[in-house]
């Protein structure tokens, strides 16, 4: 387990629901997808680069995802990742994306 975090740390994160509208191979050293995610009219679309290789690119398109949208951009090889899609590492080494269990409005905040 990680050390205890300050209670306000979680409150600083802006975690939103978005829908993957495009998933394609990223130009990175490790196998990675470049996903364009729609967060609704307030935030628009953002790009995330992630190692969700246990999914086919076409299977990611249309999927709702949970993402942190206020971490700033991160350089990943020649790609820029604007948001962090949250997921769980599974025993096979892949990552399973977290998603809401029902259809919620794009841009909804996770609380």
Predicted region positions:
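Phosphate-backbone binding interfaces of nucleic-acid-interacting proteins
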Residues: 1-111
